[in-house]
From Swiss-Prot:
Positions of transmembrane segments: none
Catalytic activity, EC: 6.1.1.23
Chain positions covered by the region annotation Aspartate: 205-208
Gene: aspS
Single GO MF annotation: aspartate-tRNA(Asn) ligase activity
Role according to the record: Aspartyl-tRNA synthetase with relaxed tRNA specificity since it is able to aspartylate not only its cognate tRNA(Asp) but also tRNA(Asn). Reaction proceeds in two steps: L-aspartate is first activated by ATP to form Asp-AMP and then transferred to the acceptor end of tRNA(Asp/Asn).
Family affiliation: Belongs to the class-II aminoacyl-tRNA synthetase family. Type 1 subfamily.
A GO-annotated cellular component: cytoplasm
Subunit: Homodimer.
Keywords: Aminoacyl-tRNA synthetase, ATP-binding, Cytoplasm, Ligase, Nucleotide-binding, Protein biosynthesis
Top-rank taxon: Bacteria
Protein name (Swiss-Prot/TrEMBL): Aspartate--tRNA(Asp/Asn) ligase
Organism: Anaeromyxobacter dehalogenans (strain 2CP-C)
GO biological process terms on file: aspartyl-tRNA aminoacylation
Amino acid sequence: MPRFITELKRTHSCGELTKADIGKEVVLFGWVNNRRDHGGAVFIDLRDRAGLTQVVFEEDVRPDVHELAGQLRLEYCVGVRGKVVSRGGNVNPKLPTGEIEVHASDLEIFNRSEPAPFQIEDKIDTGEEKRLQYRYLDLRRAPLQQTLMTRAKVNHLTRNYFTDKGFLELETPFMVKYTPGGARNFLVPSRLNPGKFYALAESPQLFKQLYMMAGFDRYFQIVRCFRDEDLRLDRQPEFTQIDVEMSFVEQNDVFDVMEGLVVKLWKEVLGIEIPRPFQRMPFEESMAKYGNDKPDLRFDMPHVVLTDLVRQHDGGGVPLMHEAVKAKGIVKAMRVPASANFSRTEIDKLEEYVKGMGAKGLARAKVGEGGEWTQSPLAKTITPALRQAINDACEAKAGDLLLFQFGKESVVHTVMANLRVHLAKRMGLIPEYGSGGAWRFLWVVNPPLFEYDEESGQWAAAHHAFTRPHDSDLQFLESDPGKVNCYRYDLVLNGFEIGGGSIRLHDPEVQARVFKAMGISDEEARSKFGFLLDALKMGAPPHGGIALGMDRLVMLLTGAESLRDVVAWPKTQKGTDLMTGAPGDVDARQLRELYVKSTFEPK
């Protein structure tokens, strides 16, 4: 064992010594962050997760220690003993320890380091693949260490908050029954049950509801979940969520508890007071004004739905708009203020941008002093009455730019939603990443319970089949499922959905009606969810809950650019771990024991 470990103990971290510690003898452990020789003395910056301390090895104090210090190189792991002294006029104001240094009297090298494949510095140009391959070195860099320490603090604050509120931290299984539909699952073959498979849980949904039925009326868990989906910058195959469920509540009770948590996190982590209650917006309004159910409210530029106006004016001289309305599509406009002052070249680039999302083009018009339209093919055919009606609906002023999309509702919403955010970044209204100093929380409420699947010709649950419909909409369950709204809610922050939940169905008769509306027979429902249906008949209480995405929450709190920056050991967009080589091959013997055979044939 190293002498410093058995005989000496660390007295301080490398980030806590100040001038109040001058004269003390201290023991520090860490890594050599920097090394330089000056006037016969060896200087190093010693680093641990708390910060940096300058250490000086002088030849006339301990020649043997000075000689050993001459061997030090970057990333050597060492222990140092010495006295804290003032740096006099050589203060480094950038460091919390910048007023002092440690004059070393003893040194032990715990381990030497080969030259690192990249610099261990705050900002580096190394590609992400190399950093992921040597993730343990990447994690030595201060920005990532600060991010993970913030994540640990969020974990701690969350547990304390819910415990103080009377919640129980309870576990749910990772290996569960596979049920078709929903997210694609990771499957685990069962050796003891040949031909059978577990699924890794994509959420604790059913088990946390069963906790409510078992009488544990306040549950929470910081839990790992798994989804075998195509990955993006904001997705990982395994992710963490703050999972919550409560009995005897309505959605306002859930809002109250979760707003309390969010306010506490922003206060404790960032020192920012977030006002309550959070804004609420119906799903229908969110889609109409912003094109999605996670609007960024840090800036304005809402969409205006013109479908009824175009219908009232019988097309108003714009055949393409008229055709979209007759085809049961939608017509939308967005007013870009004159202050944006986009050139024709810039507007042409906007058209290329929307075409990349499947749009056929970008209709536009510049508003003149008298309300006339210029720089627009629409101006040649549109009737003065429809033009004025659109100007009024959009509150257009001279110099403003009007942008239009019309066609299939889902495409128009998506294109206009993305265009709005793209424009805001181009105009400097929001930064490319991070909050830009503003935090606009929003509850999006009352969405449809069902969405129509054109391929299957069936209604499907927009989220899951266990969400409670509005009582006033139960009359439409059989006759017109598209009219049924529900007690589902999403918590949105600056264009990101950071959580979602619902009030659950606790009435077995209504649950059966919901399944039938989705085309799920009694036999299929019992095969998939028989245990839950039985539990609903055993005095199930009214209950509801929510889950917050821990990874995204920390990403927003820290200003990170992607989820991979807030996860210690992330996967690539192909789902691979470049450090360990996962996923890897399995030998044939093990596959035989699992009764599994690979049909993959390499090209």
